[in-house]
Amino acid sequence: MASSQQVNLLSCENVSKAFGERPLLRDVSLGVSKGERIGVVGRNGAGKSTLLRVLAGAEPPNSGRVTRGASVVVGELDQVGTSAEHATIRSHVLGDRDEHDWAGDSAVREILTALLGGFQSEQLDRRISDLSGGERRRAYLAEQLIREVDVLFLDEPTNHLDVEIIAWLAAHLKGRPKIAIVTVTHDRWFLDEVCDHMWEVVGGNVEEYVGGYS
């Protein structure tokens, strides 16, 4: 939970969400403030991903409301990821940024190198549809890390990543302390390394704890 002395970048009030007759969230009220690192845990099917999607604005709640500051920018990595059928890595990850702009940005080059193996034309001009599942996942993650956001929602960000890249990702996120991060992951090491708060989704409620997973 955000400190009473901190202003929430994003919050939900009395949010409920169900699929069919099955309630996943019941009257949940939470807030996310600048720089918080929150891990979302719970049993499979408890509603962890649903909570992230509702907070990110990807799904509407059945009742209650989600609010964010007028200038707050949100990024989201979901478990699936989508892109235009013929989009290239370049267009999907870098958008319409001029090459001289991103190529001169050491942070962008680091992300492209760590996740995509480099930023040469033959690498960036590959189609997303031609990539393996793991390569697509890394491309979607690179897109979110390159964006300038205030709150970043990550749903199973370590899926399809090897241990070296997971370690790089943890260090990268720790090196960007101004971004608030809310992540669902089964990777206990990642939770302990990155997160300082836990939200446990249990029976439609969200219980909050200070500290990492362990």
Where are these regions (language model features)?
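ABC ATP-binding cassette signature C-motif
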Residues: 1-214
